[in-house]
Amino acid sequence: MSKRQSAKYKLDRRMGENIWGRPKSPVNRREYGPGQHGQRRKGKMSDFGIQLRAKQKLKGYYGDITEKQFKKNYIEASRMKGDTGQNLIGLLERRLDAVVYRAKFTPTIFSARQLVSHGHVYVNGVKCNIASRLVKPGDEITLGKKAQEMALVAEAQSLPERDLPEYLAVDGTKATYVRVPTLDEVPYPVKMEPNLVVEFYSR
C-alpha cells in the first residue's frame, strides 16, 4: 500500500466512516480510529468537536485540501448570495480535480489531482494543471491522448460503486459541466453537513 493510500485509509479510520465508499476501506471491517487505543475514543462530543469533525470530513473528502484553500472557499461561499453551506458545496464541486473524479476519469480524488497537476487535463481545449481551478457551467473537460490510455482511467470507469451525477454530461473521456449542484445532488457515500462547517468558522 502506498503512503498516499495509507493516509487516505487513516482518514477513514479516524472518521470511523468509509468516506469515499471504497470496498477496501478498513472501516468496512472495524469502525474505530487508528492506533491501539482507537476503540476507546467514543463518547459524547462537544459542539466544537462535532463542528470540527464535519469540517475535517468534508475537507478530507476532497483530497484533504489545505486549510488555507478550504477556508478561502468558505469565505467566498459566505460572500455569495444564498445559503453559505450550499454555496460551499457548489464551490468544492466546481474544483477541477473534483470534476475529473466525478466524471470517473480516475478511481480516487487523489489520482484526479495528480492527473491534473501532471498536465493531462484540458478545459475547453486548453491544458490546465491547477487542481483548484473552478470550472463553470458549459465548460468542457477532456483528457489528453496519453491519459486516455492509462490503466487507472479504465479502472475508474469500471467502478460499480460510483454513479455519474446528473450535473455532468460524460461521453467517454469528455465531460461537460452542466450546472452547479445542490448538496442533495452530490453523490457523497456518507452524510456531509456543511451547515456545521459554517458554524465552525462562524464561532
Swiss-Prot record:
GO molecular function list: rRNA binding; structural constituent of ribosome
GO annotations of cellular component type: small ribosomal subunit
Annotated GO biological process: ribosomal small subunit biogenesis; translation
SUPFAM superfamilies: Alpha-L RNA-binding motif (SSF55174)
Entry keywords, A to Z: Ribonucleoprotein, Ribosomal protein, RNA-binding, rRNA-binding
Residue ranges of the region described as Disordered: 1-46
Pfam families: Ribosomal_S4, S4
Domain S4 RNA-binding span(s) in chain numbering: 94-157
Subunit description: Part of the 30S ribosomal subunit. Contacts protein S5. The interaction surface between S4 and S5 is involved in control of translational fidelity.
Primary role: One of the primary rRNA binding proteins, it binds directly to 16S rRNA where it nucleates assembly of the body of the 30S subunit. With S5 and S12 plays an important role in translational accuracy.
Family affiliation: Belongs to the universal ribosomal protein uS4 family.
NCBIfam families: PRK05327.1 (NF003717), rpsD_bact (TIGR01017)
Protein name in UniProt: Small ribosomal subunit protein uS4
Lineage summary: Bacteria, Pseudomonadati, Pseudomonadota, Alphaproteobacteria, Sphingomonadales
Gene that specifies this protein: rpsD
